[in-house]
UniProtKB/Swiss-Prot annotation:
Binding residues annotated for [4Fe-4S] cluster, in chain numbering: 469, 472, 477
Annotated region described as Disordered, given as residue ranges: 492-511
Residues at which substrate binds: 127, 156, 185, 221, 241-243, 282-285, 321, 348
Annotated GO biological process: thiamine biosynthetic process; thiamine diphosphate biosynthetic process
Keyword Repressor (UniProt): no
Name of this chain's protein: Phosphomethylpyrimidine synthase
Family according to the record: Belongs to the ThiC family.
Cofactor requirement: [4Fe-4S] cluster
Lineage of origin: Bacteria, Pseudomonadati, Spirochaetota, Spirochaetia, Leptospirales
UniProt keyword annotation of Transit peptide present: no
Entry function: Catalyzes the synthesis of the hydroxymethylpyrimidine phosphate (HMP-P) moiety of thiamine from aminoimidazole ribotide (AIR) in a radical S-adenosyl-L-methionine (SAM)-dependent reaction.
Assigned keywords, A-Z: 4Fe-4S, Iron, Iron-sulfur, Lyase, Metal-binding, S-adenosyl-L-methionine, Thiamine biosynthesis, Zinc
GO molecular function, one term: carbon-carbon lyase activity
Amino acid sequence: MESTQEFQVPLKTIRLTDGTEYQSYHTEGSLSDKKPSDYKNGIPKIRKEWIRTRLDRGDTNHSQMYYAKKGIITEEMRYVALRENMNPEFVRLEIACGRAILPSNRNHPELEPMIIGRNFLVKINANIGNSALGSSIEEEVEKLHWAVKWGADTVMDLSTGKNIHETREWILRNSPVPIGTVPIYQALEKVKGKAGNLNIQVFLDTLEERAEQGVDYFTIHAGVLLRYIPFTANRVTGIVSRGGSILAKWCLAHHKENFLYTHFDEIIKVMKKYGVSFSLGDGLRPGSIADANDKAQFGELETLGELTKRAWEEDIQVMIEGPGHVPMHLIKENVDLQMKLCQEAPFYTLGPLVTDIAPGYDHITSAIGAAMIGWFGMAMLCYVTPKEHLGLPDKEDVKQGVIAYKIAAHAADLAKGHPGAIKRDNLLSKARFEFRWEDQFALSLDPETAKSFHDETLPQDRMKTAHFCSMCGPHFCSMNLTQELRKFAQEKGMEEKSEVTICNRKKESGK
């Protein structure tokens, strides 16, 4: 743990057999010591005193953007600066200009602050939540624990089944990471599933209920406007967002503009009161690569840019949700247009999936797009599991989705040249070349799987120091042969001779 006088920032320390130590970003935090039997008690409220000071002072806007614009570096900002190895003033400036957000509801004191922005580490979100057809409260909290264990930076509770309020309460009291939700789901439940009966008061009541519990960011589909809906008529897959389809149905039923758009200022008031961040939803995102980058998608994106400005005028943090299903050659256009229309507000994308032909493997089809869009400047990736399009994910699906997206996020960090991103790669490569098998496992994103694959054929302890694996055996390992070659060259003075030969050739060629 790295500490200041006021708080400790969670870090995972990996101790290698050569004496080297590597410290990595750690999302599990205080939840790592929890057992399922302890979930009712929740985790420590590390922000309790910070929040109390602001309440005692009479603050009415609890958004981190509000404080950042005033030149105040909050405890949350300093916490984030430690986690990211950044200067606290740089963190404040990125939040103040809207290029990054620090989701942190004042009623989520258990939160261990993190930041989402293209100039920071690429983050990943994991979705959990029950449906009408399965999953208990305990199972959802266990999914939360499982997701952050493997590296989820935020978690969205998308529950649509029974006990939504209680499920969310358990999740929040046990979450060290920001929790996001989609309030329109519960609002629809309150009107017995009839979209036409929705209204702004039902929605605001739902919003207040969730904000009071401590939800850190809301997906609000306020950009689904009446005039954009006809653009989806000739799509291959129509409207694939649940929230988008609900609001499109309401608009057509009443032939009126989306009530979330017309009452956006009232929604802002709730966000301001609790410090909740907007995740402006892409209700018209493409659900197939054939529909990518069409009028409906980009029309909505333009409206999200307008709404971003309105939220910023009230010092409310905003990130923008994005697609979806986009072939590789169209991905960069999405990022460039989003940055232009939304003034560089953080981009938060679902993949995108780069092909539609792989049900059961969409964690792979989407991780390809995720790595690319992360490289181009996206700030947070929403994971996709192998069950995407097929069913409700279980624990193993959650793990597979998180790991696939940790790989994509790290690949993007490497491509962007994020300070320190390559250190872990170099340590693992060195351990691999030196046949330090235990260190290779420890430095892996998934040590358990790496070790189990190795031990399937070479389980003996002595094989943890062997200079080969089952792929090549003892006589054909290229790295072992390279080591022998280097040793031979060193003994025969070949390095010096090689340098002399190169110098002579350069002289002969006149270089």
